[in-house]
Amino acid sequence: MTMHEFFENFGIKINDSKIFSTALTHNSYANETKTKETYQRLEFLGDAVLQMYVSKFLYLNFTNAPEGKLTKTRSDIVRQETLSEIAKMIDLGKIIRLGQGEIKSKGYEKPSILSDVYEAVTAAIYLDQTEEVLISWIKSTIFKYIEKNDYKELNHDYKSELQEIIQAEIRSDLEYRVESQKHIEKDNKIEYTVSVNLDGKKYGIGTGFSKQEASQNAAKDCLNKLKKSAK
């Protein structure tokens, strides 16, 4: 699939091919081909564009949410993990320009590269297309992902909730431990298993593709068990 064919699937007729090629160019490709520009500057702009439109979406759809809650939710949505999943969802990796070394190491599957290129492409659309086309792109990618996933659940801070309960009981023996980590080959990710311990006993267990995610899931498991034991 060519670059033009890929974007035509989203109703985007490219005007400036150079800016889109730049948005898809990794450092490794630029070094091998002596290309001057890479996606890094566009990534910078794309991050700001996404921040603005996601902020507007949250402001208009969560009219009673306080500023802190909106900020946390936005961070959950525009983080690397989420953006890389969106890039995978639309097969963006297939058109990224990588050097041979990155191709061999499957750079087209790496979350850091995928999320950066998604931001860079968003910037290219912002510069090359109308706002209507840009909004259509954002709706069909990042907002589509939001609709498929319970991001309200992602926004809930189980660790803070558990900490508040422990503090209310005047206890300070809450501890999180990394029990194990393993490489998930098909996803090219590290899955962590974290336990939460109270009074030296394991009360919750959780897994995730980051220590933070696994800790949140462990805290959620612990909260569920504490609530059941309180009945």
From Swiss-Prot:
Pfam families membership: dsrm (PF00035), Ribonucleas_3_3 (PF14622)
GO biological process entries: mRNA processing; regulation of gene expression; rRNA processing; tRNA processing
Family matches, as InterPro entries: dsRBD_dom, RNase_III, RNase_III_dom, RNase_III_sf
Enzyme Commission code(s) on record: 3.1.26.3
Cell compartment(s), UniProt: Cytoplasm
GO cellular component term of the entry, any: cytoplasm
Residue stretches making up the DRBM domain: 157-228
Record's keyword terms, sorted: Cytoplasm, Endonuclease, Hydrolase, Magnesium, Metal-binding, mRNA processing, Nuclease, RNA-binding, rRNA processing, rRNA-binding, tRNA processing
Keyword Phosphoprotein assigned: no
Predominant location category: cytoplasm
Domain of life: Bacteria
Cited SUPFAM superfamilies: dsRNA-binding domain-like (SSF54768), RNase III domain-like (SSF69065)
Reactions listed under catalytic activity: Endonucleolytic cleavage to 5'-phosphomonoester
Enzyme class, first EC level, given as a word: hydrolase
Residues involved in Mg(2+) binding: 43, 116, 119
Database matches in SMART domains: DSRM, RIBOc
UniProt keyword Magnesium, yes or no: yes
Similarity remark: Belongs to the ribonuclease III family.
Function according to Swiss-Prot or TrEMBL: Digests double-stranded RNA. Involved in the processing of primary rRNA transcript to yield the immediate precursors to the large and small rRNAs (23S and 16S). Processes some mRNAs, and tRNAs when they are encoded in the rRNA operon. Processes pre-crRNA and tracrRNA of type II CRISPR loci if present in the organism.
Subunit structure: Homodimer.
UniProt-recorded name of the protein: Ribonuclease 3
Gene of this entry: rnc
